[in-house]
Regions:
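Asp-based, Mg2+/Mn2+-dependent phosphohydrolase catalytic module
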Residues: 1-108
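GNAT-family acyltransferases
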Residues: 2-6, 15, 78-205, 221-222, ...
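Short, high-confidence coil segments that cap the C-terminus of an alpha-helix
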Residues: 38-40, 166, 228-229
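Conserved catalytic-core motifs of GNAT/GCN5-like acyltransferases
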Residues: 45, 65-67, 235, 248-266
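Alpha-helical segments flanking ligand/cofactor-binding loops in enzyme cores
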Residues: 52, 244-245
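Conserved G/P- and acidic residue-centered "switch" motifs that form tight phosphate/ATP-binding loops
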Residues: 177, 210, 240
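Conserved acetyl-CoA pyrophosphate-binding loop and the N-cap/start of the following alpha-helix
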Residues: 206, 210-219
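Conserved beta-strand-loop-alpha-helix junction that forms the acyl-donor binding cleft
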Residues: 233-244
């Protein structure tokens, strides 16, 4: 768990303490011993020299710019123009990405929406088993026994969440951590235009409990918070009455009727 935020300027300690009261803000310099902080810390740096030094510390970093800055700041995966751009979500994201901890997207009394991990693949396959011929579901890789599909799954887990900050997430029981379905955002196209599409699947044993509505609403809220798009889409087969009703309840409206499915949109 992220506990300590190290900053390289004493003048920033008090403002950071005020902005992030849940973390311990500590100063650092080239003599700081980070040995005891490797599992629960993040370091802020503002120069190429500092980032080069920190590359050997085995700690996650965020680079930040300063007025009249001439540094390239290529030594960190994360860069903000100033410390004022920091927020708790970014700090937690950087920390979790570095330590390969799945990010939690939303929490609800009935579910936890979080990133899928390698260890979830077998549970995902068991969940899909009864629905393998369902044409309305956007699947993760279909068979974990297939080496190529398993490798594609690993690649998705490794790259998609990190690069896009969205994807298909797991819907887990908050009490038992049982995987109940998936729900999320996929890249898609309308004609030649790129768009983001809402997708969901709830396992048969967990339906009729309003999980799909609350999970999808959490994703809509996430899209707004992250400013991912100004219009979210959903493709629904014409005979999928439950999904049509869900889309309407969420605020989607049909914008185009095609041969096999209807296209719905929700302005954000």
């Amino acid at each position: 768990m992220l506990t300590f935020i190290f900053v390289n300027n004493q003048n920033f300690i008090q403002p950071l303490e005020k902005a992030f009261p849940n973390y311990v803000i500590k100063p650092w310099n080239y003599e700081t011993d980070f040995t005891l902080y490797k599992q629960n810390s993040l370091v802020l740096a503002s120069s190429d020299k500092e980032l080069t030094y920190l590359s050997h510390s085995l700690l996650p970093t965020i680079a930040y710019g300063t007025p009249n800055d001439t540094n390239q700041l290529f030594g960190s995966d994360y860069l903000v123009d100033s410390l004022e751009e920091l927020d708790s979500a970014l700090l937690e994201t950087v920390f979790c990405r570095y330590h390969h901890i799945p990010l939690t997207i939303a929490k609800h009394k009935d579910f936890v929406l979080r990133e899928i991990t390698f260890s979830d693949l077998d549970s995902l396959w068991q969940l899909y088993d009864k629905e393998r011929n369902n044409p309305s579901i956007n699947w993760f890789p279909f068979s974990p026994e297939n080496k190529t599909e398993r490798e594609l799954f690993y690649q998705y887990i490794s790259d998609s969440y990190r690069f896009y900050q969205y994807g298909l997430w797991g819907v887990f029981s908050p009490d038992t951590n049982i995987l109940m379905g998936h729900c999320g955002i996929i890249n898609s196209n309308i004609g030649n235009d790129f768009c983001l599409e809402l997708c969901y699947f709830i396992g048969d044993n967990f339906r009729r409990k309003h999980l799909a509505f609350h999970a999808c609403q959490s994703i809509i809220d996430y899209c707004k918070k992250m400013k991912l798009t100004t219009m979210l889409y959903a493709r629904i087969l014409k005979d999928n009455t439950p999904s049509i009703g869900l889309a309407s309840t969420l605020g989607f409206s049909m914008i185009q009727s095609l041969e096999d499915y209807d296209l719905y949109g929700l302005p954000l």
